[in-house]
């Protein structure tokens, strides 16, 4: 950003008083890195620490940030404020050093709230669909020439980044309920896509507590703000009388203010009509598969319509929507002759979904768009607590694929829980008599164990939130072909 652009921005968004150097602990996370990127472009000195380099840290290095690939007390020296990821423990040496030096330590969402303070904030919350909906809203506002700032939890593929500093008055941000930190945000508009039991350790295992927290989040809206909520979701329908703010509903339901009608999917695209109050019907072509993405688009359209954005800009943005990283992310289609000697091809799709509802939506999108394909899923459960709490739901949804390969649970720092492991889950699924799951004990064996089950007309879904995304990219790089010891050594 040049001096003239920065001066224009400062006329809208004042500089944070006495803050020059901002240090991020856990800077390599998508949400943390996105905020750091916006602040770097605003002219602040940025430093941060993480355990290993990744594309997020590389992008920040390119912007002039200082990155430490360790956690040491001296890393916070001279920082005006320290921003901490929810994944970082209180005994982290940098956090301890910051407290000792009386440097303010704040959570990620508190810094996001500061970015939102002087802008027209649009926050997207909900158990599922936040990242994609945030990207859709951002794409529509950009297409309309409003030059928004956005901070997303996933890669916005059209922009090639998780976050971007715009010169307009809008800030569009994903709001994270996993640690209840979204309560720091005070947006003008809030979308809630759905509410399900997840991250229940944050809410003391009490679903009523989770529901009340969403209500509290919506009460952060000013009385002239607006809540945009999916009325198809039974929990949201239950909570509507308690919102106490102007509300627009959306969904397939007949009583939705913005209603999805006549949905059909052809390959990776959805086609449907949106019915809006006092507006002409909108015939949408959405470059994203699945009924769940039609709902995400309906939320984005509801917000854009309320803002007065032209229908043509909305339609252009949705038809050209490029999606987000690891959300039904098409990685290629590969011939099987070099893989297992069979004719034909296999499509490879990478998807972040790790809750049964998300996995179910991904499977349905795959079946609707490619009904004749042999559907093969490589699944990595994420967290032992989630596997335990949603065990039966996982067992039910995973039987919907034709072939299932399962990696060990990605612990995300949790200790193992007896009976909440992949071997037990495979045994339960096998006992239901629909499919015979294959346990993959070592990620290095994925290509070797995948090759024999491919038929030549396959769609492979690589599914999960752990390190399985790296496995998906590795499969794409080797074009699904199992590697010989010599090839592995060469790599």
From Swiss-Prot:
It catalyses: UDP-N-acetyl-alpha-D-muramate + L-alanine + ATP = UDP-N-acetyl-alpha-D-muramoyl-L-alanine + ADP + phosphate + H(+). It is found in: Cytoplasm. GO terms for cellular component: cytoplasm. InterPro entries: Mur-like_cat_sf, Mur_ligase_C, Mur_ligase_C_dom_sf, Mur_ligase_cen, Mur_ligase_N, MurCDEF_pg_biosynth, UDP-N-AcMur_Ala_ligase_MurC. Keywords: ATP-binding, Cell cycle, Cell division, Cell shape, Cell wall biogenesis/degradation, Cytoplasm, Ligase, Nucleotide-binding, Peptidoglycan synthesis. GO terms for biological process: cell division; cell wall organization; peptidoglycan biosynthetic process; regulation of cell shape. The keyword Cell membrane does not apply. It is an enzyme of class 6 (ligase). It comes from the Bacteria. Pathway: Cell wall biogenesis; peptidoglycan biosynthesis. Its EC number is 6.3.2.8. Cell wall formation. Belongs to the MurCDEF family. This is UDP-N-acetylmuramate--L-alanine ligase. The gene is murC.
């Amino acid at each position: 950003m040049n001096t003239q652009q920065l001066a224009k921005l400062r006329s809208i968004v004042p500089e944070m008083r006495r803050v020059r150097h901002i240090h991020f602990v856990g800077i390599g996370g998508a949400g943390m890195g996105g905020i750091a990127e916006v602040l770097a472009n605003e002219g602040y000195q940025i430093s941060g620490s993480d355990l290993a380099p990744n594309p997020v840290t590389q992008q920040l290095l390119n912007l002039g940030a200082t990155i430490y690939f360790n956690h040491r007390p001296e890393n916070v020296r001279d920082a005006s404020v320290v921003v901490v990821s929810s994944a970082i423990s209180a005994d982290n040496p940098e956090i301890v050093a910051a407290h000792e030096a009386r440097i303010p330590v704040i959570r990620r969402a508190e810094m996001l709230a500061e970015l939102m303070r002087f802008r027209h904030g649009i926050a997207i919350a909900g158990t599922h669909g936040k990242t994609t909906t945030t990207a859709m809203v951002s794409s529509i506002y950009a297409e309309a020439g409003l030059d928004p700032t956005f901070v997303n939890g996933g890669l916005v593929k059209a922009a090639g980044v998780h976050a971007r500093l715009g010169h307009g008055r809008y800030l569009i941000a994903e709001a994270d309920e996993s640690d209840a930190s979204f309560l720091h945000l005070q947006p003008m508009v809030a979308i809630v896509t759905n509410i399900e039991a997840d991250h229940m350790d944050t809410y003391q295992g009490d679903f009523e507590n989770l529901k009340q927290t969403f209500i509290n989040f919506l009460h952060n809206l000013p009385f002239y703000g607006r809540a945009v909520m999916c009325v198809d979701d039974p929990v949201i329908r239950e909570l509507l009388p308690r919102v106490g703010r102007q509300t627009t509903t959306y969904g397939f339901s007949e009583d939705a203010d913005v209603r999805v009608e006549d949905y059909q999917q052809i390959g990776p695209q959805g086609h449907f009509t949106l019915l809006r109050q006092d507006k002409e019907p909108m015939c949408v072509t959405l470059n994203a598969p699945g009924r769940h993405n039609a709902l995400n688009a309906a939320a984005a359209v509801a917000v854009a319509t309320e803002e007065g954005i032209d229908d043509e800009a909305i339609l252009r943005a949705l038809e050209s929507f490029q999606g987000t990283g690891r959300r039904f992310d098409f990685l290629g289609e590969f011939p099987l002759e070099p893989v297992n000697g069979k004719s034909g091809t296999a499509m490879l799709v990478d998807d972040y979904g790790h809750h049964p509802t998300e996995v179910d939506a991904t499977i349905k999108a795959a079946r609707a768009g490619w009904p004749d394909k042999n559907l093969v899923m490589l699944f990595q459960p994420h967290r032992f607590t989630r596997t335990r709490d949603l065990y039966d739901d996982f067992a039910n949804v995973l039987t919907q694929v034709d072939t299932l390969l399962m990696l060990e649970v990605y612990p995300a720092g949790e200790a193992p829980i007896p009976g909440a492991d992949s071997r037990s889950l495979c045994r339960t699924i096998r006992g239901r008599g629909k499919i015979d799951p294959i346990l993959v004990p070592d990620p290095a064996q994925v290509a070797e164990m995948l090759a024999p089950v491919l038929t030549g007309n396959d769609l492979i879904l690589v599914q999960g939130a752990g390190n399985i995304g790296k496995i998906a990219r590795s499969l794409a790089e080797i074009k699904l072909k199992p590697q010989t010891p010599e090839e592995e050594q060469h790599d």
